[in-house]
Each structure stands twice: as C-alpha cells, then as structure tokens.
Amino acid sequence: EVGDIPMAPRERRQWGERLGEISQRWDAGDLDLRELHLELAALLRGFAEARSGEEITTATVSEILDMAATAGPSSVEERRRSVRAAGRPLDINPLGHVGELLAVWEQPSFDREPQAAGQEALTHAREVVTRW
C-alpha cells in the first residue's frame, strides 16, 4: 500500500510557488499546451513522490494507476479508457487522481481549445497541491 506522508506547510507552499511560476509562463504565452502539460506532469510527479514515498517521477502512468488504490475499475486499462472518455480524472484517491490527470494530459489536445484546456489543467494541478 502506498503511504501518505504528511507535508509541512512550508514545503506545500514551495510546490504552490512552482505551480505559480508555471502558471505565469502559461499566461505570458511562453508555453504551448503540450509544454504546459509536460511541466505540470513533472511537477505533480514530484509532488506525488514527496507525498507517497513511492518512486513516481520515473513511473509510467499505468504503473502509477496500478499502485494507487481506487474506488473505480480495478483494471488499469479500463481506468485509462474511462478517464480519456471523460476528459478528466475520476478517482478520489489522491495518487489515482494524479495518475488519471497524467493520462488525460498524455492525449493529443488537437480537439480542445488550448486556452480553456490550459486553465483547466492548471486548476486540476492547483487542487492536487492544495488538497492532498
């Protein structure tokens, strides 16, 4: 079972500051949607590793989903399909939620309006950093 390591307020603030820097670069037009997703994915992988104590930064999305307890389908592939169809994470388990966000961000974003998709990605990342 994956741990849930408490995080000091100062450390959580540092993760929030990193997220703020990414958000500023997005707002300034320095990142396209793909670059934003890659930066947010790296940030959330590091955050999830700090919270879980598990090697998340190098794990695949499938490995992350496999190690996270879930209230949803037990099959990783079924979870990926459900999340991609919904276009958003469905799991209430924090690590599962991160894994599902990564799965959504892996998908090509040609069918989404980039500005709205970017703001949605930032909102989801902010929720993880402030609530987990």
Question: What label would you give each PLM region?
Answer:
Residues 1-25, 130-132:
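Hydrophobic, helix-length membrane anchors
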